[in-house]
């Protein structure tokens, strides 16, 4: 399997939550809890939005992310096709 084809669970999970606008609860290592929608993420941070408030949270401070609905991660080819359908439907 080529390096580019490796299954990256964290990125695919966060991207699924972002694309499908699934609300999440985020628990931090200090016990603080917040909830909202993931707007963006990179290697080190997650941008969480709740109402008109944004929080840039460092990943090393996150203990757990709990989505409000079940997340089914599919093989990459199926997921890419589904995301393309979602994008087409949003444009309609």
From Swiss-Prot:
One of its GO terms (cellular component) is cytosol. GO terms for molecular function: RNA binding. Gene3D superfamilies: 2.30.30.100. HAMAP family: Hfq. Belongs to the Hfq family. Homohexamer. RNA chaperone that binds small regulatory RNA (sRNAs) and mRNAs to facilitate mRNA translational regulation in response to envelope stress, environmental stress and changes in metabolite concentrations. Also binds with high specificity to tRNAs. This is RNA-binding protein Hfq. The lineage of its organism: Bacteria, Thermotogati, Thermotogota, Thermotogae, Thermotogales. The gene is hfq.
């Amino acid at each position: 399997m080529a390096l580019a084809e490796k299954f990256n669970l964290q990125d695919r999970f966060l991207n699924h939550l972002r694309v499908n606008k699934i609300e999440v609860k985020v628990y931090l290592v200090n016990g603080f809890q917040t909830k909202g929608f993931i707007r963006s993420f990179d290697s080190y941070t997650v941008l969480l939005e709740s109402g008109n408030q944004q929080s840039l949270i460092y990943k090393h401070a996150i203990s757990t992310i709990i989505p409000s609905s079940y997340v089914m991660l599919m093989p990459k080819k199926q997921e890419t096709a589904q995301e393309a359908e979602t994008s087409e439907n949003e444009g309609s």
